[in-house]
Structure formats: C-alpha cells, structure tokens
Amino acid sequence: MTYHNDSTDLETLEIQELETEMDDSMHEEDIEFNEFVDNTSEFEEAESNQQNEAIDGEHIANDQSDMDSTMTQLVTANSSKPDSLYLLPVKERPFFPGQTLPIILDKNSWSKTIKKVIDEKIHYIGIIYVEADDHHKAKPKDFAKTGTLIRIHEPKIKEDYIQLIAEGVCRFQIADWLSSSAPFRARVNYPNDIRNGSPKEFKAYGLAIMNAFKELLPLNPLYSEELKYFLNRYSASDSQHLADFAASLTAASNEKLQDLLDTLDLSERLEKVLSLFKHEIEVTKLQFNIRERVEENLSQQQREFFLHQQLKEIQKELGMVKDDRTADADLFQERLDKLELSEEATKKAEEELGKINMLDPQSPEYGVARNWLDWLTQLPWGKYSDDKLDLGRARKILNKGHDGLDDVKDRILEFLAVGALKGEISGSIICLVGPPGVGKTSIGRSIADTLGRKFYRFSVGGMRDEAEIKGHRRTYIGAMPGKFVQALKDCETANPVIMLDEIDKIGSSYQGDPASALLEVLDPEQNSEFMDHYMDVRFDLSKTLFVCTANTLDSIPGPLLDRMEVIRLSGYITEEKIQIAKHHLWPSLLEDAGLNKKQIQITPATIRHVIEGYAREAGVRNLKKQLAKLIRKLAIKFVNGDMEQTTLHVNDLEEMLGQPRFTPEKTNQQMGTVTGLAWTSMGGATLTIEASRVHTLNRGFKLSGQLGDVMQESASIAYSYIASNLDKYKADPEFFDKAFVHLHVPDGATPKDGPSAGVTMATALLSLARNEAIKKPLAMTGELSLTGQVLPVGGIREKVIAARRVGIKELILPDENRKDYDELPDYLKEGMTLHFAKHFDDVAKLTFHIRSKSSALKKYLSKAVISTEEKTEQETTS
C-alpha cells in the first residue's frame, strides 16, 4: 500500500486523476488542499487572533464552549463506529487521526478487503502499522498496539490497483482477532484521551505548536499548503487534533510516530510532538543554511560570468579585444608567416583560413578547420637540429651507457663517420635485433644523445589499426594525425630519432595492415613526401633517423625488412653481465632504495653466482630483478636497525633468493647422445639429441620432442644419409634393416624448428649404429644435405656464448661460417677450439675413433653367424 504524506506528492499522475474524479461533496469536506488561497493577510489575521486569545483570558470560556461543541459533533459523527473492523497493515509510516490522504493499494492483495468494506453501510476500515516486510502476510504479533480508524471516500478499483481517499477519524486498539490472515478483521475498542491538565495548559501547548509552524514556514516552503489547511481547520484550543496533525507532518522515524499514536495522555503527547518539531526545525535550519551557501556561490559565479560577458562586449565596442573568430584567424596567420611551408601546404592553409573567417565559431566545421590549422602550424616546417659528429664524444656516450656490444658501437661510429664526411646524416632505417633485455631501446636513446637530436619512442607491438600510423580522415569525429606527425610536433624538429619498438610484434586486422603502412615511412625513396591522412599535405621525413627494435626477424614482412639495415645484438656472456651489474645495475638499484655503496657491497663472485644460478637469460633484465630482490631483503634489516653495513657473499644467496633455478649443465657422452647448438629469440642454447634402438626385426624411424616441419625434414635427411653410408663409416650395413630407431630431442614442452641440427642428428644416429659414444665432449651445429655436405647456419655468436656458458670449449661449425666466427671479439674466442667441416666425413673423423675395415667386417660377420643360428633354431622348433 502507498499513501502520500505531503502536498507535493499530490502532483503525481495517479493523484491528479483521483482529484479530478472527486465529486462536489468531497470539495465541501476540504479534502483538496489546492482550494486554499495563498493569502498572507489570512495568516497574519490568524496569528493576531492567537495572540489576542493568549492575552485576553475572558475568551477561554468561549473557546472551551467551542471545543465542547466540536466534541459533541465528533461524538455524533462517531456514534456509529463499528465494533469490528477490517484492517489494512501498513509498513511505510503510521496514519494519524485528522489526516486526509490519497491511498493506492495493490489490487491482488487487497481487493477482497476493500470490496467487503464497500458493501457495508459506512465505509470504515482500520489502518495499523506493522513491522513485517511482507505486510499482507503479517502475523498478529507484528501489528502495533494502536491504529487509526479511517473513513473511505470515492474508492476506485482500476485494472492493476485500487485508489481511494482516506480520512483519519480516531484511534482504536485491537481487542480480539476475528481473522488473523488476509483479509484481517478484529474486534476493536476506541480509547479516550487522558486529559491531565487545565485548558490553559493545553491552549499554551497549541500556541507553542503554532509558533513552531510559524518558525518552520520561512525555512521550508513545502509546508505552506499544510499550514494554510492547518489554520483554516484548527485553533490553538484544539490541542488534541493539533498534536496529531503536527505529528503527521514531521519526518520522524516510524517507531517514534507509532509511539505518539500509542500515547493517550494528551499532555505527554503534546510534549513529544513539540520535541519532534524542534528537531525538525533544527534540521531544516541546517538544510536552509547549506542551500543558502550553495545559492550564494552560484549567484556569485553567475554574477562574475555576466560581468565578464559585459566586459567582453564593451572591449569589442572599443576595439580593445577581438572576437574568437578574428583572434583565431590572426593567431594562425601569425604562425604561418613564421613557417617555411611548402607550396602545397601554403595553399591548403589559406583555404582553411578562409573557412575560419567565414564560419560561425559554434559550427562543427569551424572546430575541424581550427584543429587542422593548429596541427599544421605546430609542425616543424624547415626546422632541423644541428648534428654533433664528434666521434670521440660519441664513443664516450656509448661506453658510458653500455658495457660490451663493441660490434654494435663500431657500427654506430661508422654511421657517424660517413655523416661527418658528408657534412650531414641523411635519414636511415636501423633495425636492432636481439633477445629481450640486451639494451636495444637504450642504444636507440644513446644514438639520439650522440647526435644531439630529439628522441621519440613509441611501441608498435600489437598495433592493428593503420590509422595509428597514417592518421584518420578528417571526416571522422575525433580524427587525429598518426604517430609520426605527433612525434614531429612533440620533438619540434624535422630530424629527430624516432624509435619503433617491438616492430616484430605488429599485427593486422580488418582495420588495415600497419606493417604495409610503414612501407612508405621507412622507405628513403618515398618518405620525403610522406602524407598523413589527417594532414593531407606532404611532409619531408627524409632527414629523420628511424631505429626499430625486434626480438626476431622471422615475423617481420619481407618488404619491410628489406628497407632496414639490421644490426644484431647478441646476448651477453657472464663476464659482460658482471661488468654491467657492477657499473650500472647495482649503483642504480642502491640509489633507488635510498642506500649507498658503503652500506651494501657485493663481490664479483656473488654476482657471478646470481647470473649462473638465477639469471641465465641472454639479457640482464632478470639479473636486475634478482639484484633488486637482494637489496629489498637487506633494506628490512637496515630499517629494523639490525645492521649498518654488510657485504653480500655467495653463501647468502640461497637464504635470500631461494634454491638456484639453474644447475650446471653437463655434456652427456653416452652412446647415441650428442650435444648440439641452437639459437632462439631469447639467445643461444645447447640442444641434446638422443637416439635409441627398439629391438625388433622391423625397420622404422620415429621422432619426438615437439619438432617443427623443417627439423623433421632434417631428421629424415640425417637418417637417410647415415643408413646409406653405414659401410663407409665402419658400421653394421644391415643395422637399420633390423632396427626400429627412435630419435628424441629433450625438453618436449618447448617447440623446436630449423635445419641447424642436421649434423647433430646424423652424428647421434651414427653413434647408435656404431655402438660407440663420441670420443670427447664437444658440441656442433650445421645443416646436413642428402649428399653429406655441411651447410652454413646462423646465430654463430649466440651459439658460441651458449657453449661457453656450459663449459664446452670445443666446437664443430660449418666451414662457410668461418668468417662469422672470425668476426667475433677475442674475449669470446679465448680458450675455444674450433673445427670447421665441409662434409660429414670431417665430422665423423672428429667425433669417432678410427676403426679398421677388417674389425668392422669381423664384427658384422659375427653378428651374421649369430643371426643364422637363431634362425635355424627357430625353424627346428617350429
């Protein structure tokens, strides 16, 4: 059930419809509040009458007689009050005598009850407060002690609800239950008010309530209609009805309102009502003060706005200031005069400037033209920074920022030397390729510092929208230029160093192919006339130096890769990592933690142990994480006061970093097992190849280890070559005819592919066929052809580093990779023994002992005799 407790709620759609349908008799009963005229003199006259009544005691008797007359009328009206009532439980708030409110009921829940009430001669029903959430399923214990008898006027049963006007008559209390479930019905009695006080006392209470009303009215205009109704219907002497009516207007809790309804002592009830009203006044005052402050702030802001507008208009009339359109046009014209625009850009700018002068500043086209001119005039047309081509200075900057990488530094210095001879450095596209954490991004920044150019970096990894490169067309809402135009604007020069990070991870989608869009940008023959879709004018990028980074070249499209000059950054060896940690990582981490070198020292042996046991990757990113973890562990002890300075030793690492993630790798010299060398995007690695014979009389060959197609083909070539040349390599010529061979590459969870393991697989198969392990610990790499030729492979530097890491000092490489090995720095070649093979015969001589043909034939014949005896025995048995 829903009913409305203030005049503002009467403005809802349902109540308006209900008021329209009310007949003339309802108007005579003063149910509609809107009939009262907003007349200030009426309120003043009522106030004057109240004051006169308080002063002149002679009127008290007359007022008492009026009250007696009113009570007589009430008794007459209530003489037909029923002994039993249908009850409407409500949970919103208690209903008070004297209230007249519209009520809306749920038809499904209360239609039976209302129909029974309508069928009776006088439409009486009881409204009583319940605490149950589901009030139409309330139990007798949920009902309050006291309810209100109401008279129903104009009940209307609609399609989904019932609407009626409820007029509160008097209090009732439940004496006995006739029906404890819906429709609720009970025998009731009607208690009388207890009047423990004189008429003067009650009248004083009435005046106090009226004064409270008068104090509340200026603070909350929502009470104006209720007050007019109040003044027209009640006087100060009618304290009983004043108390109930005043209580119905407060925002007190349901419990306090029900307590008022339960209170029969009139003096006590008036005290409680006054207390509630005083609280209502205090809350309303607080709300009024808050509202006043807010309105004052708003008024001040509005006043300032109007004054600014007036000032602006006055300044326009006096010629002291220009309007927005003129100001924008003058600003852009001033910028254009200072720029060295191309003829095409000048023509386009004049067209857009003409639009600025013609269009209304509020139109969308004006905003588009203004934004375009803003971008155009902020590009560095004809602005170039001076290159610093001092090679000595360049080498110092590179050495300061990076340890090792001498080949990369030399290549950068060569690039600068050519520029010094020409007097300028033309735009170039460099691609730095290497494992994560080897310093590709930092080298790009060092190149910019070396040249004295501005540096701008953005990542193209995961980029799928072509508009990120070449911008959006201006027809789109919120269109913006591409990344290269934004880079030129931020750098404010036309020859910055722009780094495209993670170019090997660029994507494509239905929105376009960013890699194809980069073809124009990264082509020295085309980027002198680069055209962004948003700008729609050509801009010269030929002086810009582009530096791209990638972990691998395999995923870069061929046409894009063809435009780049590739510089490989191989992984660091242990000695290089130690120097990087000592000179760069450790001091930087101490500074970030608020410590210094005197407080925490670390020995080179400790750094080496961290590298070999916890950070064996090609770069130094994970090494930095492990060193930072050590510093954090020690920082706790410094804060707790447990130490003032310390030196980290190898023995401290397991306690602080846990058990080592990596253990020393050992070469396996069992029969059929050979160590190979591999290259991945993470750097070089060793690769163990295992071959085993399954003893059956059936020929077969099986591969495992999650091998790619190319590696499977390499295995097939190795199998075919060894099987056809067993006699040549002094092995059993019929070995593969009677053996099912299984070739496995461990670490099966890691995908593997490539042709460089062909020689290693052939060596493992030959070891199995000869029943002989390789004669010394070594590692090898190379592609094998079907005729036994050893073909060149890539990643020689990474593979050499991987061999040094596991302690292998002897390697077999393809003869055509000799030049790649010779280019390696001396510190990588130191202590290494290299063999270069042109044919697999060279590999076999290095890996197996020389075996005479007679011994091999003797071994073969002995096996043949054993095989013949076994066959004869089987035939005899059968």
Swiss-Prot record:
Key words of the record: ATP-binding, Cytoplasm, Hydrolase, Nucleotide-binding, Protease, Serine protease, Stress response
GO cellular-component term (any): cytoplasm
Catalyses which reaction(s): Hydrolysis of proteins in presence of ATP
Gene3D superfamilies assigned: 1.10.8.60, 1.20.5.5270, 1.20.58.1480, 3.30.230.10, LON domain-like (2.30.130.40), P-loop containing nucleotide triphosphate hydrolases (3.40.50.300)
MF annotations from Gene Ontology: ATP binding; ATP hydrolysis activity; ATP-dependent peptidase activity; sequence-specific DNA binding; serine-type endopeptidase activity
Domain Lon proteolytic: 668-850
Subcellular location: Cytoplasm
Subunit structure: Homohexamer. Organized in a ring with a central cavity.
Record-stated family: Belongs to the peptidase S16 family.
Designated name of the protein: Lon protease 2
Organism from which the protein derives: Hydrogenovibrio crunogenus (strain DSM 25203 / XCL-2) (Thiomicrospira crunogena)
Gene expressing this chain: lon2
